[in-house]
Design a protein with these regions (language model features):
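Acidic, low-complexity intrinsically disordered segments
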Residues: 2-193
Length: 193
């Protein structure tokens, strides 16, 4: 049975190491959502919910990695995936190149899917077998030959010990008014979508 690996780019961020680029500010990308505000910067763990949302809404067995180290990524790639999907932004394209090279060496049979805002770069086409420049669930369903009718909608929030954020779990639904960054800054590629 075919398997899918979905991942963000590898960490760490904001330091000069072999597996990352020093020009990427840790304030924005080291699993944090903040701007350079010095000691007043609020730290927060950032989860790429888009990847989780895709994984929950396809039938193909899927593993999601959130900011793995390169070592963790390569170890997972070696587990025999048919597809490896990498989500990235423009600032992390150099990392994507290294990750693609690692996939080609560790699992040459795997097809690489590139997605996220970084796909506005025309040069990314040379690195992926498939480029997702649209809504991810529908794209993956087509790629994996799954029909939307086959899969009941599933949400990424789940109860732990019968509770969600400390409250008793109840039946309900999540309505997503939109996916992706809501800001639409003129200088950013997110407005492209």
């Amino acid at each position: 049975m075919k398997k899918l690996l979905l991942t963000t780019v590898c960490g760490p961020f904001g330091v000069n190491t072999d597996d990352c680029t020093e020009h990427v500010m840790p304030e924005l990308f080291h699993a944090q959502v903040t701007r350079s505000q010095g000691i007043f910067s609020i730290r927060s763990t950032y989860v790429s919910y888009g990847l989780e949302y895709i994984a929950k809404n396809i039938k193909t067995p899927t593993t999601v990695l959130q900011y793995p180290t390169m070592k963790q990524f390569i170890s997972e790639v070696k587990k025999g995936y048919a597809y490896v999907g990498i989500s990235f932004v423009i600032a992390t394209f150099e990392k994507v190149k290294k990750m693609v090279k690692a996939v080609r060496e560790a699992a040459p049979q795997a097809k690489i899917v590139l997605g996220g805002y970084g796909t506005v770069l025309p040069e990314c086409e040379a690195y992926g077998d498939y480029i997702c420049r649209e809504e991810g669930v529908a794209f993956m369903q087509r790629l994996l030959k799954e029909t939307p009718d086959d899969i009941p909608p599933s949400h990424v929030v789940y109860a732990t010990s019968g509770k969600i954020l400390g409250f008793p779990a109840m039946k309900g639904a999540v309505v997503l008014a939109g996916l992706g960054c809501p800001h639409g800054c003129e200088f950013c590629a997110t407005s492209h979508y």
